[in-house]
């Protein structure tokens, strides 16, 4: 059994990768989010990312990366390998972004870390169907308004929404999984969650060509009691 960390954004692809890693028998020891100094993620708010890790019962590591970023990543990964006795890294990457090679694979190679990419170049339709089959609840946390209307922000990726999204992607020629930045998601429930999270009061904000969910000042995403969960889940 190999010891691995999962590179965690909090989105649907990271959650699917988590499911596949456990299914493959890897020992998942922590979730790691790489970030620049003083990070502010519009698509993946850090307070919610931390709550996800709490719900999953896993340590969350916020790893600061300094420039030059190639060397910064390698130094950070080397520290993680030593501190956590790692054999490998799991990512939710589906494809190259903008034609660029797989960044993490290049950074891990000189360190002797195996990179597991269970979603790599899979059918988008199959991946979205797998998300539903595993009862992963994901919401569009950020959309590129040049591709999707701002009203998509905050929508839950349920069966009906996915049909609409895939039809639109086929017609307009964009990636149905959002791999090229068309949209981002945040997961509020799924396999391993002690209880669902909810996004009460979150609002849609705008910045340049992005529409994104923002947390009300002074509030945190709350966990719903397992007794009030809409479905039973095997843990």
Which sequence ranges carry the predicted segments?
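ATP-dependent adenylation/nucleotidyltransferase module used to activate substrates
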Residues: 1-142, 171, 230-231
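ATP/NTP-dependent adenylation/nucleotidyl-transfer catalytic domains that generate, transfer
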Residues: 2-3, 58, 87-90, 103-104, ...
């Amino acid at each position: 059994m190999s010891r691995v960390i999962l590179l965690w954004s909090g989105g649907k692809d990271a959650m699917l990768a988590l499911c596949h890693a456990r299914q493959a028998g890897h020992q998942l020891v922590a979730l790691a989010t790489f970030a620049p100094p003083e990070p502010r993620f519009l698509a993946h708010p850090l307070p919610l990312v931390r709550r996800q890790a709490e719900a999953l019962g896993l340590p969350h590591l916020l790893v600061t990366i300094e420039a030059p970023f190639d060397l910064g990543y390698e130094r950070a990964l080397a520290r993680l390998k030593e501190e956590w006795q790692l054999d490998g890294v799991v990512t939710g990457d589906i494809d190259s972004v903008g034609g660029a090679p797989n960044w993490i694979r290049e950074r891990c190679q000189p360190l002797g870390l195996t990179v597991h990419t269970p979603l790599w170049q899979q059918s988008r339709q199959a991946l979205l169907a797998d998300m539903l089959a595993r009862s992963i609840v994901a919401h569009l946390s950020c959309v590129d308004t040049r591709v999707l209307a701002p009203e998509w922000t905050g929508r839950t990726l349920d069966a009906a929404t996915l049909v609409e999204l895939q039809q639109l992607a086929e017609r307009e020629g964009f990636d149905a999984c959002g791999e090229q930045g068309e949209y981002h998601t945040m997961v509020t429930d799924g396999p391993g969650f002690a209880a669902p999270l909810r996004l009460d009061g979150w609002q849609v904000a705008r910045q340049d060509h992005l529409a994104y969910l923002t947390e009300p000042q002074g509030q945190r995403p709350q966990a719903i009691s397992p007794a009030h969960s809409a479905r039973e889940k095997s843990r």
